[in-house]
């Protein structure tokens, strides 16, 4: 694949318009359009596969008659069960899904190093897209499942951070179009998140699993073709080789001139690190939406709408649509609030968000009680309630937390602290995979009540952190 990436990109590319002169794409550089289109198709493939994964594993691949065909699965199963104890097919599926969802947030750290020091961003993105396409197609074969997952994880690591960095590289540091550029970029992601479960999920559930995974692979190939077609509009690559050595030397000289960390800087770093376990608790209700919730819904939710059996994977599309709407509503609400009274700080918003988000699994706890009482199924209205309440709360947790770490981190450690912030998603998804394994052994009310309690406790702890460490984390210009 490394040779493929090298062959696909010519040594010299035609010059592209640069700076403010390039406004052909809705006032932005043409490269933004190509990068956004590529990201749309990459996210289509990613979320299409993810919508199917836990259902495919628990309902097919990890059943006794199939699991023996998977190369290397016994070693992985032994490693998981050495920590958790014996796992049923559903429990093993949830654990593997949790590990996959967690490592997705870890591998981009290595992809960034590969791009910065060895290949450059463009070649690394092409390598990542090629590996992801290969991984999606390998998912069609039972024996190659773990190889497919490895290709997907390495591919995401190579692709994700570097294509976002290329969006930023289209603009000069003082160019005020940068913020709106990332809004366009994120909008492309949201379109993909809505469409992917509808297409890949429907094919996987209604036709055959490999059709869904194949559709995801086709989406990734389209993304790769789009990226290569628009390569002349991509930003210039940072210098590698001897030039990079000069840049590193200059960077070392600049670093020597930076002031050392102050006592307050060290206190801030300590508080931000202490926050990580609380952040892990705050996301368990949201992250379970892609793991335990589809499994529970498949058994206990009436998925018939107007006489048609709605695929369980469509729940992911509902969540994507709702999360987009609630994110926009949250932004509008806080703008309205700030014009009338003082806007709360980040920890206050996050604490409020976690307390609201706890209502999502609490609603499913009630729904589980209805299931137990009636011995029947509950309507899709419970899904809409869970999604709406959870997404209102989550809109004030994840992005607000990112803003907190970006603002409060000492300037010389900002990149490191952002990376540390994302580690809570790695740990959180792994933890959620273990929690999802309890779905088979705990009553539904207790299972979802546990999640509501964990998220609510995170809300209380976030507000306690605000009370205790408000002075440490306050903005420098706070009176």
Task: Give the residues covered by each predicted segment.
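Intracellular loop-helix junctions on the cytosolic face of multi-pass helical membrane proteins
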Residues: 1-31, 173-174, 201-307, 330, ...
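Hydrophobic core of transmembrane alpha-helices in multi-pass small-molecule transporters
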Residues: 40, 135, 144-159, 373-396
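Central cavity-lining transmembrane alpha-helices of secondary-active solute carriers
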Residues: 94-113, 317-330
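C-terminal ends and interior cores of transmembrane alpha-helices
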Residues: 130-147, 354-375
């Amino acid at each position: 694949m490394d040779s493929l990436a090298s062959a696909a990109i010519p040594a010299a590319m035609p010059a592209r318009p640069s700076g403010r002169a390039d406004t052909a794409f809705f006032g932005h550089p043409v490269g933004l359009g190509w990068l956004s289109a590529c990201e749309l198709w990459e996210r289509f493939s990613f979320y299409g596969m993810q919508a199917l994964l836990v259902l495919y594993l628990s309902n097919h691949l990890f059943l006794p008659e199939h699991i023996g065909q998977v190369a290397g699965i016994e070693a992985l199963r032994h490693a998981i069960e050495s920590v958790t104890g014996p796992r049923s097919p559903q429990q093993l599926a949830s654990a593997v899904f949790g590990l996959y969802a967690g490592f997705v947030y870890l591998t981009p750290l290595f992809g960034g190093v590969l791009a910065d020091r060895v290949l450059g961003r463009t070649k690394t993105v092409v390598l990542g897209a090629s590996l992801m396409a290969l991984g999606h197609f390998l998912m069609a074969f039972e024996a190659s499942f773990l190889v497919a997952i490895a290709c997907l994880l390495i591919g995401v690591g190579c692709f994700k951070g570097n294509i976002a960095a290329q969006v930023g590289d289209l603009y000069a540091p003082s160019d005020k179009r940068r913020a709106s550029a990332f809004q366009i970029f994120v909008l492309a992601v949201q379109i993909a998140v809505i469409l992917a479960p509808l297409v890949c999920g429907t094919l996987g559930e209604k036709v055959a699993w490999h059709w869904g995974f194949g559709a995801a692979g086709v989406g990734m190939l389209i993304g790769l073709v789009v990226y290569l077609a628009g390569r002349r509009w991509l930003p210039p690559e940072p210098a590698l080789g001897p030039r990079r050595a000069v840049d590193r030397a200059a960077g070392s000289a600049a670093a020597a001139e930076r002031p050392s960390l102050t006592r307050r800087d060290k206190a801030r770093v300590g508080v931000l690190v202490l926050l990580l376990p609380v952040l892990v608790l705050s996301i368990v209700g949201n992250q379970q939406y892609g793991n335990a919730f589809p499994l529970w819904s498949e058994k206990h939710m009436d998925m018939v709408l107007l006489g048609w059996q709605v695929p369980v994977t469509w729940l992911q599309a509902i969540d994507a649509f709702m999360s987009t709407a609630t994110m926009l509503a949250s932004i509008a609400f806080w703008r309205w609030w700030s014009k009338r009274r003082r806007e709360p700080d980040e920890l206050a918003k996050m604490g409020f968000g976690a307390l609201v988000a706890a209502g999502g699994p609490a609603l499913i706890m009630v729904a589980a009680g209805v299931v137990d009482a009636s011995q029947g199924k509950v309507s899709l209205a419970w899904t809409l309630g869970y999604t709406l309440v959870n997404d209102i709360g989550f809109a004030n947790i994840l992005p607000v937390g990112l803003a907190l770490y970006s603002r409060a981190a000492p300037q010389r450690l900002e990149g490191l602290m952002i990376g540390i912030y994302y580690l809570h998603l790695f740990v959180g998804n792994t933890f959620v995979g273990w929690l999802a394994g309890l779905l088979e052994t705990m009553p539904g009310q207790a299972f979802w009540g546990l999640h509501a309690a964990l998220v609510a406790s995170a809300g209380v702890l976030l507000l306690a952190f605000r009370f205790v460490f408000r002075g440490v984390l306050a903005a420098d210009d706070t009176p």
